[in-house]
């Protein structure tokens, strides 16, 4: 379960079994602790435990720029009927793309009671699973009635990538749209072509994945969504198949970028084995419509130029004005 605040920052993250790979290693650290309800143990920053936690958080959190983990692990033990008061928070994030968290990893789960209670503005949350929650939230450990609860607690700091905007996908998901390609799998390119006697379509939109494959999204005045799945191996193929005004173009010349650039990605980081995402559901098509409209509204202020040269004599130069937005589709 993921819960966000009104600024779009994650405040609660419930985990399933992601930390099973290190749970026994953490238990081993504290196996000799018998006479203390709480103890802190410094770790090396590059310890396997810290590194594995960092990898899990990068994988499970969305839109992350940086994860910092305090190398001190706090071990806490709760016996039946220990009285635990509500812990009040007065921590306030300094920026709208940064949050500090407590990560709680269960080492021993009580038979009854002992859940963590989080006081959230939209309703209180109780959990006896591994959980990460923002330090902006008040919390309380409920009384253990039967058995014992032992947990490991770590301080986590997360910086998130700043999104350009967020586009509604469905009732449960909004998709962050970025101008930064790092960590993204797809790029929507809204393309305007300089007037040229060989050009038939002057505005077009394609989604380009990490392999360089292109899915035609729109080609009618920049707003009509193409419903049939038209996939090309490269943007050069899109030009030959859609943009140019005559079918013999492939036979007359080929296209290259003089800087060996891909229209969306760093060429040296292309992954040829990646299949391109294609729309299937009504939510997919509605999202694309919203994305195209947003890109069109930004195309006069957020853009770059991309040039392809045809090997004619003299060379034929095609100049494309490109607005790029990077994103990931929900899994």
Swiss-Prot record:
<comment type="similarity">
    <text>Belongs to the poxviridae C4/C10 protein family.</text>
</comment>
<dbReference type="Pfam" id="PF03336">
    <property type="entry name" value="Pox_C4_C10"/>
</dbReference>
<protein>
    <recommendedName>
        <fullName>Protein C10</fullName>
    </recommendedName>
</protein>
<dbReference type="InterPro" id="IPR005004">
    <property type="entry name" value="Poxvirus_C4/C10"/>
</dbReference>
């Amino acid at each position: 379960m993921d819960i966000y605040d009104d600024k779009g920052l994650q405040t609660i993250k419930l985990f399933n079994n992601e930390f099973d790979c290190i749970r026994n290693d953490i238990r081993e650290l504290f196996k000799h602790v018998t006479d203390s309800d709480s103890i802190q143990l410094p770790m090396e920053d590059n310890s396997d435990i810290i590194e594995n936690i960092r990898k899990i958080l990068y994988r499970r959190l969305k839109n992350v720029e940086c994860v910092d983990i305090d190398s001190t692990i706090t071990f806490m033990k709760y016996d039946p009927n220990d009285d635990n008061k509500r812990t009040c928070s007065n921590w306030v994030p300094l920026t709208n793309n940064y949050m500090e968290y407590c990560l709680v990893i269960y080492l021993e789960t009580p038979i009854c009671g002992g859940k963590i209670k989080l006081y959230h503005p939209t309703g209180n949350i109780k959990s006896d699973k591994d959980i990460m929650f923002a330090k902006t939230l008040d919390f309380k450990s409920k009384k253990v009635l039967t058995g014992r609860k032992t947990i490991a607690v770590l301080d986590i700091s997360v910086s998130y990538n700043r999104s350009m905007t967020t586009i509604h996908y469905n009732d449960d998901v909004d998709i962050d749209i970025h101008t930064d390609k790092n960590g993204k799998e797809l790029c929507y390119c809204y393309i305007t072509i300089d007037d040229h006697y060989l050009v038939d379509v002057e505005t077009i939109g394609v989604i380009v994945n990490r392999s360089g494959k292109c899915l035609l999204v729109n080609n009618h005045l920049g707003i009509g969504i193409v419903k049939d799945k038209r996939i090309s191996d490269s943007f050069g193929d899109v030009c030959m198949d859609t943009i140019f005004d005559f079918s013999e173009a492939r036979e007359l010349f080929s296209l290259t970028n003089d800087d060996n650039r891909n229209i969306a990605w760093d060429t040296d980081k292309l992954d040829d084995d990646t299949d391109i995402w294609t729309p299937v559901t009504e939510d997919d098509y509605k999202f694309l419509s919203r994305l195209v409209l947003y890109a069109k509204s930004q195309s006069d202020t957020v853009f770059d130029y991309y040039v392809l040269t045809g090997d004619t004599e003299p060379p034929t130069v095609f100049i494309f004005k490109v607005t790029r937005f990077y994103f990931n589709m929900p899994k």
